[in-house]
A protein has these predicted regions:
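Conserved anion-binding
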Residues: 2-5, 73-79, 84-158, 162-166, ...
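Catalytic domains of carbohydrate-active enzymes, especially glycoside hydrolases
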Residues: 26-38
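A C-terminal functional module that forms or caps the active site or interfaces directly
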Residues: 42, 46, 161-201
């Protein structure tokens, strides 16, 4: 979530087409700049890809696929999205490394010139305890800073990190977009999220 002319994305985290249609109907005429984030759950559903491809051009569409594989495979995966000309953002994992991120950026330029590649850093479902269980010895903040710096060198368009790390990377990623997931209203259930913020805290 960001201020002024930037976009507030509504997370369409369901495989239900009727629920997605309801979400869009309720928000499409908002005075705010609203975009829609679609993850693997809806993208891989029966109507997902077809529905996304038919969304009006004025809708800001974020395809949150979090790609991570060898550079060639990620590149091919992005080329396979060439029919989705209305997608504005696509996520890949920063932990895939420099070569993978550069390959993704090159593939995006050939597939859809307006497609921006976002580097996902540490998922908001991780706590300091659970990130160490994966073999990391650094704090989440240090990992995010390191990954954001790498994404900048790879010339990606933006960073996805929790609001808790956003301030720390603003000075590093000056012209890159920073998108903060894990936004909850006061009193909402956190679900499987660990590092969350309210909208006012995120702003």
């Amino acid at each position: 979530m960001t201020r002024k002319n930037n976009t507030i994305f509504v997370a369409c985290d369901t495989s239900s087409l009727s629920k997605i249609k309801k979400i869009i109907k309720l928000t499409k005429n908002s005075s705010l700049n609203i975009g829609y984030k679609f993850g693997l759950e809806f993208f891989n559903s029966k109507h997902g890809r077809s529905f996304i491809s038919k969304l009006p051009k004025q809708h800001m569409v974020w395809l949150d696929l979090k790609l991570k594989d060898i550079p060639n495979t990620v590149s091919s995966s992005i080329h396979s999205l060439k029919d989705l000309t209305n997608v504005h953002y696509l996520t890949i994992h920063a932990s895939g490394g420099m070569e993978m991120m550069q390959a993704a950026k090159r593939a995006a330029a050939k597939t859809n010139k307006k497609l921006k590649i976002l580097a996902v850093t540490v998922l908001t479902s991780f706590s300091e305890k659970s990130i160490k269980q994966t073999g990391h010895t650094k704090t989440i903040k240090k990992i995010v800073i390191q990954q954001a710096s790498l994404a900048k060198k790879a010339k990606l368009d933006g960073i996805v990190c929790s609001g808790h790390e956003a301030k720390s990377i603003k000075t590093i990623c000056k012209k890159m977009q920073i998108i903060t997931p894990g936004i909850r209203l006061e009193g909402d259930s956190k679900g499987d999220q660990q590092r969350v913020m309210t909208p006012s805290q995120a702003f």
